[in-house]
Protein backbone atom coordinates (compact mmCIF):
# COMPACT_ATOMS: atom_id res chain seq x y z
CA UNK A 1 0.00 0.00 0.00
CA UNK A 2 2.79 2.41 0.86
CA UNK A 3 4.35 1.88 -2.58
CA UNK A 4 1.12 2.80 -4.30
CA UNK A 5 0.63 5.87 -2.11
CA UNK A 6 4.21 6.99 -2.76
CA UNK A 7 3.69 6.34 -6.49
CA UNK A 8 6.65 3.98 -6.72
CA UNK A 9 4.92 0.90 -8.12
CA UNK A 10 6.69 -0.12 -11.34
CA UNK A 11 3.84 0.97 -13.59
CA UNK A 12 4.47 1.67 -17.26
CA UNK A 13 4.24 5.40 -16.58
CA UNK A 14 6.88 5.19 -13.79
CA UNK A 15 9.15 3.01 -15.93
CA UNK A 16 8.90 5.54 -18.76
CA UNK A 17 9.78 8.38 -16.35
CA UNK A 18 12.84 6.36 -15.31
CA UNK A 19 14.06 6.27 -18.90
CA UNK A 20 12.79 2.91 -20.10
CA UNK A 21 11.55 3.07 -23.68
CA UNK A 22 8.06 1.67 -23.20
CA UNK A 23 4.52 2.54 -24.20
CA UNK A 24 2.69 3.63 -21.07
CA UNK A 25 -0.83 2.56 -22.01
CA UNK A 26 -2.91 0.24 -19.81
CA UNK A 27 -3.20 -3.29 -21.18
CA UNK A 28 -6.84 -3.44 -20.13
CA UNK A 29 -8.22 -0.15 -21.43
CA UNK A 30 -5.51 1.76 -23.30
CA UNK A 31 -5.33 4.77 -20.93
CA UNK A 32 -2.01 5.90 -19.37
CA UNK A 33 -0.98 3.27 -16.80
CA UNK A 34 -0.23 4.86 -13.42
CA UNK A 35 -0.78 3.50 -9.92
CA UNK A 36 -3.90 5.65 -9.57
CA UNK A 37 -5.20 4.34 -12.87
CA UNK A 38 -4.58 0.63 -12.16
CA UNK A 39 -5.92 0.76 -8.62
CA UNK A 40 -8.83 3.15 -9.14
CA UNK A 41 -9.30 4.88 -12.49
CA UNK A 42 -9.28 1.95 -14.91
CA UNK A 43 -12.71 0.69 -15.99
CA UNK A 44 -11.81 -2.76 -14.67
CA UNK A 45 -10.73 -1.32 -11.29
CA UNK A 46 -13.99 0.64 -11.12
CA UNK A 47 -15.89 -2.58 -11.81
CA UNK A 48 -14.04 -4.40 -9.01
CA UNK A 49 -14.66 -1.56 -6.53
CA UNK A 50 -18.30 -1.49 -7.65
CA UNK A 51 -18.94 -5.15 -6.82
CA UNK A 52 -16.87 -5.11 -3.64
CA UNK A 53 -18.77 -5.12 -0.38
CA UNK A 54 -17.35 -1.69 0.44
CA UNK A 55 -19.75 1.19 0.17
CA UNK A 56 -17.28 3.72 -1.17
CA UNK A 57 -18.09 7.41 -1.37
CA UNK A 58 -18.12 9.17 -4.71
CA UNK A 59 -14.71 10.76 -5.25
CA UNK A 60 -15.22 13.98 -7.22
CA UNK A 61 -12.72 15.22 -9.81
CA UNK A 62 -11.08 11.75 -9.98
CA UNK A 63 -7.60 12.46 -8.55
CA UNK A 64 -4.73 10.98 -10.58
CA UNK A 65 -2.60 9.92 -7.61
CA UNK A 66 -3.72 6.94 -5.55
CA UNK A 67 -2.69 8.65 -2.30
CA UNK A 68 -5.19 11.44 -3.08
CA UNK A 69 -7.91 8.84 -3.56
CA UNK A 70 -7.04 7.21 -0.23
CA UNK A 71 -7.17 10.62 1.52
CA UNK A 72 -10.51 11.47 -0.10
CA UNK A 73 -12.00 8.16 1.03
CA UNK A 74 -10.58 8.46 4.55
CA UNK A 75 -12.08 11.95 4.91
CA UNK A 76 -15.47 11.07 3.43
CA UNK A 77 -15.83 7.63 5.02
CA UNK A 78 -13.38 7.12 7.91
CA UNK A 79 -15.19 3.98 9.12
CA UNK A 80 -14.44 2.06 5.91
CA UNK A 81 -13.18 -1.52 6.22
CA UNK A 82 -9.54 -0.71 5.49
CA UNK A 83 -8.48 -4.36 5.40
CA UNK A 84 -10.89 -5.02 2.52
CA UNK A 85 -9.80 -1.78 0.84
CA UNK A 86 -6.09 -2.58 1.04
CA UNK A 87 -6.47 -6.20 -0.07
CA UNK A 88 -8.66 -5.10 -2.99
CA UNK A 89 -6.00 -2.63 -4.14
CA UNK A 90 -3.31 -5.30 -3.70
CA UNK A 91 -5.43 -7.77 -5.71
CA UNK A 92 -5.85 -5.26 -8.54
CA UNK A 93 -2.07 -4.83 -8.71
CA UNK A 94 -1.52 -8.60 -8.62
CA UNK A 95 -4.13 -9.07 -11.35
CA UNK A 96 -2.35 -6.50 -13.51
CA UNK A 97 0.95 -8.34 -13.01
CA UNK A 98 -0.60 -11.74 -13.74
CA UNK A 99 -2.06 -10.45 -17.02
CA UNK A 100 1.24 -8.82 -17.96
CA UNK A 101 3.10 -12.09 -17.46
CA UNK A 102 0.68 -14.41 -19.26
CA UNK A 103 -1.85 -15.14 -16.53
CA UNK A 104 -5.57 -15.47 -17.01
CA UNK A 105 -8.03 -12.63 -16.67
CA UNK A 106 -10.29 -12.86 -13.62
CA UNK A 107 -13.63 -11.12 -13.55
CA UNK A 108 -14.52 -8.57 -10.87
CA UNK A 109 -16.75 -11.00 -8.96
CA UNK A 110 -13.96 -13.55 -8.66
CA UNK A 111 -11.46 -10.95 -7.45
CA UNK A 112 -13.83 -9.62 -4.79
CA UNK A 113 -14.62 -13.17 -3.66
CA UNK A 114 -10.90 -13.91 -3.31
CA UNK A 115 -10.46 -10.63 -1.39
CA UNK A 116 -13.23 -11.59 1.05
CA UNK A 117 -11.73 -15.06 1.58
CA UNK A 118 -8.24 -13.65 2.10
CA UNK A 119 -9.39 -11.06 4.64
CA UNK A 120 -11.56 -13.63 6.44
CA UNK A 121 -8.59 -16.00 6.77
CA UNK A 122 -6.35 -13.12 7.89
CA UNK A 123 -8.81 -12.10 10.59
CA UNK A 124 -9.28 -15.67 11.81
CA UNK A 125 -5.53 -16.18 12.12
CA UNK A 126 -5.07 -12.88 13.93
CA UNK A 127 -7.98 -13.62 16.25
CA UNK A 128 -6.50 -16.98 17.24
CA UNK A 129 -3.11 -15.35 17.83
CA UNK A 130 -4.54 -12.59 19.99
CA UNK A 131 -6.12 -14.91 22.55
CA UNK A 132 -3.90 -14.82 25.60
CA UNK A 133 -2.65 -18.23 26.57
CA UNK A 134 -2.63 -19.25 30.19
CA UNK A 135 0.81 -20.02 31.50
CA UNK A 136 1.18 -23.65 32.50
CA UNK A 137 0.81 -24.34 36.19
CA UNK A 138 4.15 -24.94 37.79
CA UNK A 139 4.02 -27.46 40.57
CA UNK A 140 6.78 -29.39 42.27
CA UNK A 141 6.81 -33.11 41.64
CA UNK A 142 8.83 -35.93 43.11
CA UNK A 143 11.73 -36.97 40.84
CA UNK A 144 11.77 -40.39 39.26
CA UNK A 145 13.57 -43.18 41.10
CA UNK A 146 17.34 -42.76 40.77
CA UNK A 147 17.06 -39.07 39.85
CA UNK A 148 17.73 -35.98 41.96
CA UNK A 149 16.18 -32.54 41.76
CA UNK A 150 18.17 -29.45 42.49
CA UNK A 151 16.42 -26.13 42.95
CA UNK A 152 18.51 -23.11 41.99
CA UNK A 153 17.97 -19.37 41.93
CA UNK A 154 20.06 -16.42 40.85
CA UNK A 155 19.62 -12.72 41.58
CA UNK A 156 21.57 -9.86 39.97
CA UNK A 157 21.83 -6.48 41.67
CA UNK A 158 22.87 -3.80 39.18
CA UNK A 159 23.28 -0.99 41.69
CA UNK A 160 25.72 -2.88 43.91
CA UNK A 161 27.22 -4.78 40.97
CA UNK A 162 26.75 -8.07 42.77
CA UNK A 163 24.79 -11.25 42.45
CA UNK A 164 23.59 -14.08 44.60
CA UNK A 165 23.18 -17.76 43.88
CA UNK A 166 21.03 -20.16 45.84
CA UNK A 167 21.14 -23.95 45.56
Predicted regions and their residues:
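Primary recognition of RNase H-like, Mg2+-dependent phosphodiesterase/nuclease domains
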Residues: 1-167
